[in-house]
Design a protein with these regions (language model features):
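Glycine-rich, charged/polar anion/phosphate-binding loops
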Residues: 130-132, 157-158
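Alpha-helix boundary recognition
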Residues: 102, 188-189
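A short beta-sheet element
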Residues: 148-186
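Residue-level signal for threonine
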Residues: 44, 166, 190
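Short, intrinsically disordered, charge-balanced linker/junction segments flanking boundaries
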Residues: 150, 189-194
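Residue-level signal for pocket-adjacent positions within structured domains
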Residues: 105, 114, 153, 168, ...
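A short, charged
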Residues: 138-142, 182, 187
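Polynucleotide-recognition surfaces of large bacterial nucleic-acid defense/processing enzymes
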Residues: 1-128, 134-144
């Protein structure tokens, strides 16, 4: 029964009693084509066929970000630190602070550039603790697509990330082919994926 069409409890009860929205003879093996096999009995055959096509994993790689173990020390608002200590471009050895995507409200295409991170200290053994996860150093500063891991009930907004590092609050996708980058971000922000 698909009772989500009922506006209130009484309407849903009538849908149930009138046998409206009942899906008969649904082949449960169809669910195996959907990754993680959620029960989606209302999907048509054409929708189910889409799960057999190319997936986002075929054209992009997803990565989690940095866990500092002590955000009070490592993460600052950009206006809390001396501006000349912030690097806006990739560099090694690491500068005192680099731009940092921590997550936040949903903003399409660009945004959430409020933080800087003491990346140099993250690699210093005297600051190391068991809670630190430094992430994939090769993905630091690379052009990526990011979104907020947590948020309200509104749809996720995918935005451009470049020349910064990301925390776990901003998971990222890296296009395997750089020419696909804008196609991916446009697709993910479309009504098709929401």
């Amino acid at each position: 029964y698909k009772l989500s069409t009922g506006n209130n409890c009484a309407a849903k009860e009538q849908l149930f009693l009138n046998d409206y929205g009942h899906y008969r003879n649904v082949n449960q093996l169809r669910f195996d084509t959907i990754p993680s096999c959620p029960i989606a009995y209302w999907l048509s055959i054409n929708w189910l066929k889409l799960f057999g096509k190319q997936s986002i994993n075929d054209i992009a790689i997803s990565k989690a970000g940095i866990v500092s173990g002590d955000d009070n020390y490592f993460v600052k608002y950009w206006h809390e630190v001396c501006f000349k200590d912030i690097s806006f471009l990739p560099q090694k050895p690491y500068a005192k602070f680099h731009t940092f995507q921590k997550g936040g409200t949903n903003r399409k295409y660009y945004g959430n550039n409020d933080y800087v991170f003491k990346l140099k200290d993250l690699w210093d053994d005297k600051f190391y603790n068991k809670s630190i996860r430094r992430g994939d150093e090769d993905s630091y500063f690379k052009k990526a697509i990011g979104w907020s891991y947590t948020g309200s009930t509104e749809n996720k907004a995918f935005r451009q990330i470049e020349n910064c590092i990301c925390g776990t609050g901003t998971p990222t996708l890296f296009a395997k082919n750089p020419e696909d980058y804008y196609h991916i971000i446009g697709f993910l922000n479309s009504k098709i994926t929401s």
